Amino acid sequence: PVAGIQNGVFTVPIVGSAVWIEFEQGDPDYPIWTGCFYGSAAEVPAAALIVPPGVPGITLQTPLQNSLTISDVPGPTGGILMKTTTGAMVSVSDTGIVISNGKGAIINMVGPSTDINASALTVI
């Protein structure tokens, strides 16, 4: 959808993905990949399901579940959520910023306060 010199969106569907193909001027020697679709609801990225139906959102997710979700859900569940396969995450929302390494270390920034590892250190 976007391409330019040293910028753009680059994705390649994995083998077995459902894709739409068109042919330039109907010539089968010139296929054009024009899009993808989900064959069933089970194929929708899990990260996309955190955005309620009817709320604008964008989800990027790899087959191993690394994801980036941007949504207009108000409050702590909206905003931007970046997660890795191992559970590390960064959440930026109207209520604050949370950074977690997925192994117990958490930095929580809400208002003027910063809390590290469940109040092991709090800076106000």
Give each language-model segment a name.
Residues 119-123:
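Short, low-complexity, Pro/Ser/Thr/Gly-rich segments in the mature regions of secreted, periplasmic
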Residues 1-110, 124:
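Hydrophobic packing positions characteristic
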